[in-house]
């Protein structure tokens, strides 16, 4: 058993803590799939806002500054909190869903290298058609 398991910081433990937090405040009526999806989008936008006008080089160094590092970590936590609550409400196992998606993408987008770089031949059919997604 890891320290995370003991403190409830594994995924299931965090989902329980979030559910208990909402229940203690009578927030469950507001935690509908639509509302949680909207809140997730808002929080993801707040994460993006931190990086909006940064150059790629500045973005790579964002965690070097304690103030911006704290903001990024807080927004990541907000995104994860709403995603976990969304999964709880809909009965989705987030780790199983991610593993299944990675499996599908490995089939959809096989590795094909040409000259050490993934060129047009290295892209899956859907990606060439503009349908590629993570």
Language-model segment annotations:
Residues 1-134:
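Flexible "arm" and connector segments at domain edges
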């Amino acid at each position: 058993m890891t320290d995370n398991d003991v403190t409830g910081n594994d995924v299931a433990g965090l989902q329980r803590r979030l559910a208990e937090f909402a229940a203690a405040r009578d927030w469950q009526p507001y935690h509908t799939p639509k509302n949680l999806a909207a809140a997730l989008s808002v929080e993801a936008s707040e994460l993006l806002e931190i990086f909006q006008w940064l150059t790629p080089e500045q973005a790579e160094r964002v965690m070097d500054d304690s103030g911006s590092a704290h903001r990024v970590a807080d927004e990541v936590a907000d995104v994860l909190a709403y995603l976990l609550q969304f999964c709880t409400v809909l009965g989705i196992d987030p780790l199983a869903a991610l593993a299944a998606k990675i499996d599908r993408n490995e089939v959809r987008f096989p590795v094909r290298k040409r000259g050490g770089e993934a060129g047009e031949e290295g892209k899956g059919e859907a990606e060439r058609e503009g349908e590629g997604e993570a």
